Amino acid sequence: METRVQHGSGSQALLQARRDSGRPHGEPDLRDVLTQQVHILSLDQIRAIRNTNEYTEGPTVAPRPGVKSAPRSASQPKSERPHGLPEHRHFGRVQHTQTHASPRAPLSRSISTVSTGSRSSTRTSTSSNSSEQRLLGSSSGPVADGIVRMQPKSELKSSELKPLSKEDLGAHSYRCEDCGKCKCKECTYPRTLPSCWICDKQCLCSAQNVVDYGTCVCCVKGLFYHCSNDDEDNCADNPCSCSQSHCCTRWSAMGVVSLFLPCLWCYLPAKGCLKLCQGCYDRVNRPGCRCKHSNTVCCKVPSVPPRNFEKPT
């Protein structure tokens, strides 16, 4: 028989002709009766069924496509595949048809095998992930908005966040019993005469340096610095000191140098004036106690009652 057969109907006609050639014309075939009772689905109907999306966006649980189509696959294992074709060819044709059915959405494929008797039929079920991605996108919206991407800046200063210590609470509460002034270290520290840097911060302009350079004592300090062999000797800093070593030698050397530099005789009076100015400046600017021997009294700050802001009647 030289007839051109096509995909579905041609193979069935070929099988029907082979069965008719081997039996009498009067007897009905049992296979024909079963084939007429079982509804055979065409490729177009299979493609329309597989393309449906059974996902829902509501909280209700949708029935799974595998559970719903299980009775159909069990009752019709032979009708989904044409008779006489190999199993792998039929599976490749169905998979190719379903791939071209929905090319726009990403598909997730799962293969399930159902066995009936000694034969098994392979089914391919496809489902779209677009609803799943839409649900995930809507649920992750509030979470993404609540993420802190930048550290908020604190409006409080660092000094306000520090806990108050005992020294801060009672820093100025200790008073002198005689004069009544504060006896903390900050208030009792002696105040010195002001000074500043000049010549691009290379020279310190202070009252002590003015006296040293004005009376040529800086030359004597340089002479003692280069003639001293002891690194720990401080005679170059205080050449007129009587408490350090080599006191007689230093005073004798200064007497000889004063013959060539008579301005050295003004050093002692200028030093006395500097001490007097320093004492006056300290007395005016030091807020604390200057008593040498006095008792300390702890004074508490009196509590001020809250003001009443009500209007008088």
From Swiss-Prot:
The gene is SPRY2. Belongs to the sprouty family. Residues 1-31, 54-146 are annotated as: Disordered. It is found in: Cytoplasm; Membrane. Residues 108-131 have a biased composition (Low complexity). Residues 17-31, 78-89 have a biased composition (Basic and acidic residues). Residues 1-14, 132-141 have a biased composition (Polar residues). Residues 175-289 form the SPR domain. Keywords: Cytoplasm, Developmental protein, Membrane. Induction: By FGF signaling. It is a peripheral membrane protein. The Cys-rich domain is responsible for the localization of the protein to the membrane ruffles. Acts as an antagonist of FGF-induced retinal lens fiber differentiation. Inhibits TGFB-induced epithelial-to-mesenchymal transition in retinal lens epithelial cells. May play an important role in FGF-mediated patterning of the mid/hindbrain region by acting to modulate the signaling effects of FGF8. GO terms for cellular component: cytosol; membrane. This is Protein sprouty homolog 2. Brain and interlimb region. InterPro entries: Sprouty, Sprouty_domain. Its main location: cytoplasm. GO terms for biological process: animal organ development; negative regulation of ERK1 and ERK2 cascade; negative regulation of fibroblast growth factor receptor signaling pathway; negative regulation of Ras protein signal transduction. It comes from Gallus gallus (Chicken).
